[in-house]
Amino acid sequence: TRILFNGLRALGVETLSPQGRLFVMARREVVLSAGAIHTPQILSLSGVGPAIDLQRLGIGVRVDSPDVGKHLQDHVQLRCVYRAQNVNTLNQLFHSKPEKALAIFRYALNRSGWLAQGALRAVAFADSQESHSRPDLQLFFSPFSTDQLGGPPHKFPGMSISVIPLRPKSRGQLTLSSADIDTPPRIYLPYLENAEDMSLALKGIDLARRIASQSALR
């Protein structure tokens, strides 16, 4: 939940357990590695962050560090969904009870069948500038389609080509919404706000459409 300090020296951490708060002291050093979201959250709750934000929540300022929680970046995934013709996809397997029962049997018997396969059947890296320097786009091919990630597949045969622009330049930020560790922080991620990110995303979608229009996929 927070780092324990003596002055500016980190001594250990405070954690939550079923028995209550637990204090763990370090013998050598404290390494904070809680991911892109929880790392700045824990730092801020420990008093290390933008002073004006910490004071607003009644958190004592140990180090005024304005960049904590700033420069947040993430990859956006854009999906092109297509109806398939004259072929079964995972959409049909998902909605067929006999097919699902057969898939479970095959997997239990010898770890084969579509349950033993990944959701992504092909991955491509592309250079939108054709400069032959390094890729700036990543594409995933999936033999199923959904309205949203995590949702059920469509009832019609479908496939998806996902486009992910690499090395995004759009930047967001994370700020505390409460001094309570159980309260999620405010996360602002302006996907595609940068004009170059938007241009690259459009090039990726155009490439996905050109791939899907090839005769082998019609």
Segment roles from a protein language model:
Residues P40-L43, A51, R79, L202-R209:
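Non-transmembrane alpha-helical segments in soluble domains
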Residues R9, G20-L22, S133, S170, ...:
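Short acidic/polar mixed-charge low-complexity motifs
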Residues V123-Q129, L137, S142-D147, F156-R218:
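C-terminal segments that line or cap access tunnels to active or ligand-binding sites in enzymes
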Residues T1-L11, P18:
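A conserved short coil-to-beta-strand element within the FAD-binding core of flavoproteins
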Residues P50-K155, R210, S215-L217:
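Mid-to-C-terminal "cap/lid" subdomains and adjacent gly/pro-rich loops that border
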Residues Q19-E29, S33-A34:
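Core beta-strand elements of the Rossmann-like FAD/NAD(P) dinucleotide-binding domain
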Residues L32-L57:
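Flavin (primarily FAD) binding-site architecture
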